[in-house]
């Protein structure tokens, strides 16, 4: 089918978009989680697939998403990417009852283009694009039009203009993530110790899935190695905080796979998109590793494609896809990564 991207500049209701996609496809395999789980592609699987990542941003929105999904269709498999800060005391809890469709006519929305202009998100020439018929029919929203950034036909996340260097990486050398971590704001508020009440709330969501006969794999998405180091420093030099989190989950009856350190499975910082998001080569690594551990999942994977990706694209963030960009991958994070093309991976969508 046609390759389109949905990448709104405004705070649109991603959950509604993903649920509409889910209802249309009725997938056997589903990915849940924040945008950090958005790097898992339909091409990795031999079964109908939808990536719902980005529709949930905390435990409460995850619970709401699962309720709405199960009211429509029951998948066979859920791969659930867990952001560890969803389970720590002091992090934002979320208020699902406030999840409403944003108005396109309120004052904040009408001022948004001028705010983006001041912030440098758009250039003066971009303001004229609609009048000059320069908008692309296969790109929906500001991020998709200007940055080739958004969710693709399978629901997975693409970041084209950052990948090829047309736009600067917002988290160059992971500086933004490290700065936010040091300030202790937002998701970095509070301690790294897991909160028992939140652990139990997450376990209840997993139990809901499994009680419907849905095989569920909980996994911790990757972090850049400097971010892992900064988190260990924040914990008094002790890197065991992740083990404590996984043990807390286990005590509540939830097993998990820890992919937080890319070095453990042969990846690295050059395969990251920023401090918190791995590229789709890392996504391929995670899925193949899951299949190696769970034979029932292995039979659903396109193993030949995964092997090709991991053989040809190690050390790079993305599989070439000319529908997104025809330009080669750049050293967009400024890490002195060798970004030479080593062969094209055959697209399979």
What residue spans do the PLM features occupy?
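C-terminal regions of proteins
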Residues: 243-349
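Soluble non-cytosolic domains of exported or imported proteins
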Residues: 56-60, 73, 168, 192-199, ...
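Membrane-embedded segments
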Residues: 26-117
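Secreted/periplasmic serine-hydrolase-like ester/acetyl group-modifying domain
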Residues: 95-212, 303-349
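Short alpha-helical segments and helix-capping/turn motifs at coil-helix boundaries
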Residues: 12-18, 61-68, 201-202
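Second-shell loop/turn segments in exported
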Residues: 51-56, 188-195, 232-235, 272-273
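Short extracytoplasmic
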Residues: 2-31
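Extended hydrophobic/aromatic segments used for targeting, binding, or gating
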Residues: 200, 204-273
